[in-house]
Design a protein with these regions (language model features):
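Structural preference for beta-strand elements that scaffold enzyme active sites
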Residues: 5-9, 46, 74-78, 99-101, ...
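Glycine/small-residue-rich loop that forms an oxyanion/phosphate-binding "nest" at active or ligand-binding sites
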Residues: 53, 62-120
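Conserved, mostly hydrophobic/aromatic
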Residues: 11, 39, 47, 79, ...
Length: 252
């Protein structure tokens, strides 16, 4: 049985890790290098590193920070934010990333997924989708959740997987930062639509939320969170022990 993954997410702005609620009002949390090392040493299965200003302001990723994070950690690193071209993939991978997450860049140019999958392999291409309900329909938002694309989220995810995305991070804007649990309805719809690994993001507030996620939706491969880990509300080692007690397969 494939073990489930617990993945802390570092949202980085101006070289610091920040975490807002519903993408508004950012608080400075810490240094990405310090936090990355802490998670690598304390049970995280992977790390996700987003430059959250990159897509909106067209800013290139902070490659110096990225190199330091990659040198410091011993777990797989996924990097996103401002990935718009194959050159962006190349730059990030050369800095030590294992996987590259594409969001707004794929919305602008879906062929980017196909080109990157062909060049680097689909295991390297992660589709990140910010999804919000609009009139009861799961809708894709771009530019860090600020711009309604009008696209149906399930159809978009299916299209991108067909193009070569090897993994999907589904971030529910409705539940992000609210700490009332993952968006199970949205995640179930995605899991039913595609066969690649699905990572749940947005809404974790407690260990129980992860237990519920993996019990209710066995098809979900990983749970991703930021603030509950950054503020030490949930300890990853303890979380994984708790999940293992519930017979959820974990790498301890």
């Amino acid at each position: 049985m494939i073990t489930k993954r617990i993945i802390p997410c570092l949202d980085v702005k101006d070289g610091r890790v920040v975490k807002g609620v519903n993408f508004q009002g950012l608080n400075d949390v810490s240094s990405p290098i310090e936090l990355g090392k802490y998670y690598s040493d304390n049970g995280a299965d992977e790390l996700v590193f987003y430059d959250i200003t990159a897509s909106a302001e067209g800013r290139a990723l902070f490659t110096d920070i990225l190199k330091k994070v990659a040198e410091t950690i011993f777990i797989p690193l996924t990097v996103g934010g401002g990935i718009n071209t194959l050159e962006d993939f190349d730059r990030v991978l050369k800095c030590g990333a294992d996987k590259v997450s594409v969001n707004s860049g794929a919305i602008k140019n879906p062929d980017l997924i196909a080109q990157a999958a062909q060049k680097y392999g689909d295991q390297c291409v992660v589709l990140s989708v910010d999804v919000k309900r609009v009139d009861g329909k799961f809708t894709v938002f771009a530019k860090g959740g600020r711009e309604n694309t009008g696209m149906d989220a399930i159809e978009w995810i299916k299209k991108c997987v067909t193009l070569g995305a090897g993994e999907v991070v589904v971030n529910s804007i409705d539940t992000d930062g609210v700490k009332q649990g993952f968006d199970l309805e949205m995640l179930e719809a995605v899991c039913d639509a595609v066969s690649v690994p699905v990572i749940a993001s947005g809404g974790a507030g407690s260990m129980e939320d992860f237990v519920t996620l993996f019990k209710e939706l066995p098809k979900v491969d990983a749970g991703l969170a930021a603030s509950i880990f950054h503020f030490s509300e949930v300890n990853i080692k303890e979380l994984k022990e708790r999940l293992a007690k519930e017979n959820i397969p974990m790498r301890l």
